[in-house]
Regions:
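ABC ATPase nucleotide-binding domain signature region
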Residues: 2-65
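ABC-family P-loop ATPase nucleotide-binding domains
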Residues: 39, 44-128, 136
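Conserved H-loop
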Residues: 45, 145-159
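Short, well-ordered alpha-helix to beta-strand connector turns
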Residues: 113, 145, 161-162
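Helical segment within the ABC ATPase nucleotide-binding domain
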Residues: 131-143
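H-loop (His-switch) and adjacent beta-strand-loop-beta switch element
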Residues: 160-172
């Protein structure tokens, strides 16, 4: 149900990333089928579509074209949210892990999905301005979209999710 954000709590090694990847269409289930009737995001932090040899600018424009969006809009949105300044025009492979997290989350938020997939919570960053912007945008999106967060930390799920499920021994 759109707008009803779900948290999936599970210990390490229980299959959290696998279930998120299956929801995104990056992995196939061993049995059964997954049917998508909504626009489902790539998982937050998934850098599979990002080419490390290219700048954030080039990656934004490429991803925008893949999704049929205005490249100028996606680029300016990501520049504003992630605040990488001159680094935005440098190869992503030169970024620190925090910079990659900010870019990845900005890219995810630049595209309107019905369902946003987040593996292990929000990106850890000490940039207060980024945290404020990204948090506000995510809260706004929660009004019309669902966020599915998988984590081993209950407090992460409590902050963003209205309901939760437990993944244990392969059973949800």
């Amino acid at each position: 149900e759109l707008g009803n954000s779900l948290g999936i709590l599970a210990p390490n090694g229980a299959g959290k990333t696998t279930i998120i990847n299956m929801m995104a269409g990056l992995e196939k289930p061993d049995e059964g089928t997954i049917r998508k009737t909504s626009r489902v995001s790539f998982p937050l932090g998934f850098m599979g579509g990002v080419n490390g040899k290219h700048s954030a600018k080039e990656n934004c424009r490429y991803i925008a074209r893949l999704y049929g969006l205005n490249p100028d809009y996606v680029e300016s949105f990501c520049r504003w949210v992630c605040g990488l300044e001159e680094y935005f025009d440098m190869p992503v492979q030169t970024y620190s892990s925090g910079m990659k997290s900010r870019f990845s989350f900005s890219l995810l938020l630049s595209i309107e999905f019905d369902i946003y997939l987040i593996d292990e919570g929000m990106p850890a960053t000490s940039d207060a301005e980024f945290n404020r912007k990204a948090g506000n945008i995510l809260q706004e999106r929660l009004k019309n979209a669902t966020v599915i967060i998988v984590s081993h930390q209950a407090q992460t799920l409590q902050k963003f999710c209205r309901s939760a499920a437990v993944l244990m021994n392969g059973q949800l």
